[in-house]
């Protein structure tokens, strides 16, 4: 048994939204907290992944799916006698690509926490906009060592990668050339 065709089609509209909402939340509210910024971003990536898995699972259970894909569009911009439409379309190929894009986005978000040295001290000679150069720490014996330092623009990275994830997911579910490039 699978979910209704209409439910899954409506769900496709919501798959790209969590990352763009995460972008807005990080930029406007959580950018001072590194933990909150990556938590918001990873949670958004997880929600998109969950939606994509529901769509993918339902897509592979539909007989003759290529003949009746999940599709929906709305009138967006009037152009005289016609309308430019925006919409979503999930056929067998886009269901597969959606599966891989959502999975890859989630893995990149998770990997990025460690890659940016989360949990390490802030560098004592790092500058915003430049890569981290390390922090000087003193051990129990009084010896000074340079260790990896956390990325100075950590929250900004998660905001921008969330915006990128929104773009990738929108590209996969778009039903026409206009929304493919928007």
What are these regions (language model features)?
Residues 24-28, 166-173:
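Alpha-helical transmembrane segments of multipass membrane proteins
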Residues 13, 96, 169, 178-180:
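Beta-sheet entry/capping signal
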Residues 16, 20, 158-165:
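Generic alpha-helical secondary structure signal
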Residues 2-11, 29-159:
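Transmembrane helix-loop-helix hairpins at membrane boundaries of multipass inner-membrane proteins
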Residues 153-157, 167, 175:
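Transmembrane-helix bundle of Major Facilitator Superfamily
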Residues 17, 43-46, 163, 182:
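Hydrophobic residues within alpha-helical transmembrane segments
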Residues 19, 91, 161, 171-172, ...:
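Functional transmembrane alpha-helices
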Residues 16-31:
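N-terminal signal-anchor/start-transfer transmembrane helix
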